[in-house]
């Protein structure tokens, strides 16, 4: 599976190191946001990597909504709690990082899931430098390009 080098499984939990997360952001998503640099003071795992892991583990449904609830730091053991129509990505303390709602037919076709995942995260990774930054500049909005912090709630 193409995601294997971007996380590990320890005692039944998914664990993502800062280096693994950063490599995914840069190599797969084309996302060079400094917050995904392994040595960033406010490092966080890219939501796109969690999105990709959910699809790889649980398949792709016709309708899916991903709600990002918390920033994920490095090396947090994650569990995936699945019900009929939801998947929660959380830690052992119960802190939820992503809530996924899904409905409709589900495919587990690995080739299709990888193709869709790669296409989606490649577009998502370019969202900040190619879409948001020019839009903000054209509207006279100031931000620090060395430390951009763009957060979104859902996709």
Describe the role of every protein-language-model region.
Residues 43-65, 118-155:
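Active-site helix/loop of acyl-thioester processing domains in fatty-acid/polyketide metabolism
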Residues 1-42, 63, 73-76, 81-134:
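Catalytic strand-loop segment that frames the active site of acyl-thioester-processing enzymes
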